[in-house]
Amino acid sequence: MKKLKINTSLEQMDEWTYESYVSDYIFENVCIEQNLDNVTIDGCKFSKCQFKDCSFMECMDIIFDHCEFENVHFNQCSLSRVHFISCRISGMEFSQSLMQDTLFQLCKGHYCDFGGSTFKDCIFDINDLTGSGFVQCDFKKTSFDKCILNSTEWFNTKLKELDFSSCEIENIAVSSDKLTGVVVNSSQALEFVKLLGIVVRD
């Protein structure tokens, strides 16, 4: 995963700036409630900010640190070198998006929708993504480490080279013809055997 391209000295902002191109700012404890469809955000850091009723279209080199998102949409969004760290992202819409070199770390994201998205060189690290949907997604060089993936849906998504061995995957829903190449631990393998309709007797 490529490193963020953020200046070491960012201009401090105490409120949102209404510009079409927002670059090289750090926002702290700011509440943002507006449509950001026509705004390109580049090289910024958001710390302990709240986003409500927002939608994004293009994000590059951004850190969201301890932020809360309510009714926020990243549908059909391009995210490049974006880090979500210790954020509350439950219910967020990421469908039909392109994510490159993007990090989700220590986030709570129940029932997120990633359907139809493409992930390239992304990292999911110690997140709770219970009930989220990864339907018809495309993964390239993407990792999941110590994530809670219980009751997630992966229909029509190739799981080749995805490593779930350190994750919780209880009640995961997948397409049986897309399992080739997935990496799981021995106990998880039994769950996948059940998904295939195979009965195991001791």
Regions of interest found by a model, annotated:
Residues 2-202:
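Tandem repeat scaffolds
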